[in-house]
């Protein structure tokens, strides 16, 4: 289970997140919808420690920590166990679909390259893109790029 409570984040005087609570049970897929500028991406970036919250708590598996001052090892543990799909796909333009999927496995999760290759090919097969593994993002449709991000 992932649970965040009382998350606050401001940029200057502009409060983006004001006491946000969110609970996601294991295995759930969640879509966060809202108008532009409502804080959707900021919330996800805060949960993944890409932004520092002004206040808030996170519980995930056996981890309990503050979103405003978490230890580096805690941050790495959370990132290794979570995945987010953003509206923009954040693929590396100079890497193939296969290389993009492998990148996170090798760098963030420290998976050996030979195993990462096997996992990445399996993931691309699951999203129907194994036949496009050697294509660069510019050669893929928007939907295909998003599926690479999911893989």
What are these regions (language model features)?
Residues 1-151:
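ABC family nucleotide-binding domain
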């Amino acid at each position: 289970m992932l649970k965040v409570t009382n998350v606050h984040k401001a940029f200057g005087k502009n409060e983006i997140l004001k006491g946000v609570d969110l609970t996601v049970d294991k295995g759930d897929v969640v879509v966060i919808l809202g108008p532009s500028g409502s804080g959707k991406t900021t919330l996800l970036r805060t949960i993944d420690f890409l932004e520092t919250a002004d206040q808030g708590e996170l519980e995930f598996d056996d981890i309990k920590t503050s979103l405003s001052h978490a230890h580096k090892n805690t941050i790495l543990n959370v990132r290794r166990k979570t995945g987010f799909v953003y509206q923009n796909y954040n693929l590396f333009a100079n890497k193939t679909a296969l290389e993009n999927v492998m990148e996170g496995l090798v760098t963030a999760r420290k998976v050996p390259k030979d195993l990462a290759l096997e996992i990445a090919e399996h993931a691309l097969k699951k999203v129907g893109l194994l036949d496009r593994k050697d294509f660069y993002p510019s050669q893929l449709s928007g939907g295909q790029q998003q599926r690479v991000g999911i893989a």
